[in-house]
């Protein structure tokens, strides 16, 4: 399977949630390019790890109302053995790794992907999202 951090380039849009308020940026727009550049900088040396986290739809939707979240939206299902139509990430600047929560078949249910950022953290991405 293609690395999950590379698949972000295939998204048709990204959604940014700030305290529950969502803004969507379509592929090809300036803000989409900014987000993708920050994502690529952050994940350039990342290592995909086995999934430890499990998402429960109702809890994820409730948590998404707090703080800043980024969601990649795809035209078709991707991911093979862990399929997804969207990938949701909680943006917390000091995190050095994070779950990518899979949305499939109408909900955020099941195992997550995990990216270890190695020596990096999420500051670059969080700063980008803060200044859109």
Predicted regions and their residues:
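Function-determining sites in protein domains
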Residues: 1-132
């Amino acid at each position: 399977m293609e690395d999950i951090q590379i698949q972000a380039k295939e998204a048709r849009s990204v959604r940014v949630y700030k305290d529950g308020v969502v803004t969507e940026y379509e592929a090809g727009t300036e803000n989409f390019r900014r987000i993708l550049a920050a994502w690529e900088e952050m994940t350039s040396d990342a290592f995909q790890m086995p999934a430890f986290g499990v998402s429960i739809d109702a809890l994820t939707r409730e948590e998404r109302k707090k703080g800043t979240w980024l969601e990649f939206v795809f035209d078709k299902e991707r991911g093979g053995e862990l399929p997804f139509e969207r990938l949701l990430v909680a943006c917390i600047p000091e995190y050095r790794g994070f779950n990518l929560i899979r949305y499939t078949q109408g909900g955020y249910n099941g195992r997550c992907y995990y990216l270890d950022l190695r020596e990096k953290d999420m500051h670059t991405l969080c700063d980008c999202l803060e200044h859109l």
